[in-house]
């Protein structure tokens, strides 16, 4: 019997992730309204959006924590809605997720946290797991920290430990949810640099959800802006910076919504009125 070898060029050119008219609802309320875009192999895509834009729901749907109401998610050329449970398990093993709050278990050491996916999803010997844990911690700059507790780590070190755990299964796709949240600018810059180094070293496809523009400009190959559950714009950092779309400009230039601006004006007016009243009271007492 003659078999045909897979077309490696076609596989390389195929998007790593494709979303087609993806919709997600919570009860009667639709959160994502027909999201469609591709994520190419080896690229870093940053998903931007304000609070309540739907970007976190999109990320949770991509990693399987939310089920779409309709539409399609394709990963590595496979439609997640039609594959077998065994194929789904294989795909999940190719995904790594670093959560916003690090999500480390306080009752475990750092090494035990990193080892958890290996112990849950593989039959590797403990000696092999220990070697892999040390290797991953070294790759994120935490060599020698395997016996520390999460409570003994700084915020930036917790983020790095979470990245090590996300990487321990050697994923092809790595997801980050607000990797710079809660970090001071210097530590946040270190996490950005780590993401760049991981991409360079392991050629992974990386998807980052953030609202930190400085971080997005540094790490992104492309950006997609989500607003009210819709894709507003998508392009390279250069294309996004030069966009004239009003919603893109509003987000990138950090212009408040009209309703928010009116609230701020009202608060400013109240503050000024109170300041005038206090000054008048001081003059009367004098």
Model-assigned labels for residue ranges:
Residues 63:
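Helix-to-loop junction immediately C-terminal to a conserved catalytic motif
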Residues 78-79, 126-144:
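Conserved ABC ATPase "signature" region
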Residues 149-153, 157:
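Conserved ABC ATPase signature
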Residues 168-172:
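A short, proline-enriched helix->beta-strand linker immediately N-terminal to the Walker B motif
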Residues 174-177:
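Catalytic Walker B motif of ABC-type/P-loop ATPase nucleotide-binding domains
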Residues 216-218:
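A short, surface-exposed alpha-helical micro-motif characterized by mixed small hydrophobic
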């Amino acid at each position: 019997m003659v078999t045909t070898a897979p077309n490696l060029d076609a596989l390389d050119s195929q998007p790593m992730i494709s979303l087609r008219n993806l919709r997600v609802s919570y009860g009667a309320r639709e959160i994502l309204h027909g999201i469609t875009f591709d994520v190419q192999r080896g690229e870093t895509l940053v998903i931007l959006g304000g609070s309540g834009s739907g970007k976190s729901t999109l990320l949770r749907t991509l990693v399987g924590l939310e089920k779409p109401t309709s539409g399609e998610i394709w990963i590595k050329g496979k439609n997640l809605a039609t594959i077998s449970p065994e194929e789904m398990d294989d795909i999940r093993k190719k995904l790594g997720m670093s959560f916003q709050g690090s999500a480390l278990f306080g009752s475990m050491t750092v090494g035990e946290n990193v080892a958890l996916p290996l112990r849950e999803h593989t039959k590797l010997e403990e000696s092999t797991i220990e070697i892999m844990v040390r290797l991953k911690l070294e790759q994120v700059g935490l060599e020698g920290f395997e016996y520390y507790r999460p409570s003994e780590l700084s915020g930036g070190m917790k983020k790095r430990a979470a990245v090590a755990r996300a990487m321990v299964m050697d994923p092809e796709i790595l997801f980050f949810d607000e990797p710079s949240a809660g970090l001071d600018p210097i530590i946040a810059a270190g996490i950005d640099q780590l993401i760049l180094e991981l991409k360079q070293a392991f050629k992974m496809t990386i998807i980052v959800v953030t609202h930190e523009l400085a971080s997005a400009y540094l790490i992104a190959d492309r950006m997609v802006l989500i607003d009210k559950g819709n894709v507003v714009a998508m392009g390279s950092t250069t294309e996004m910076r030069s966009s004239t779309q009003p919603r893109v400009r509003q987000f990138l230039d950090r212009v408040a919504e009209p309703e928010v601006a009116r609230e701020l004006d009202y608060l400013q007016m109240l503050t000024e009125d109170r300041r005038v009243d206090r000054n008048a009271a001081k003059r009367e007492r004098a």
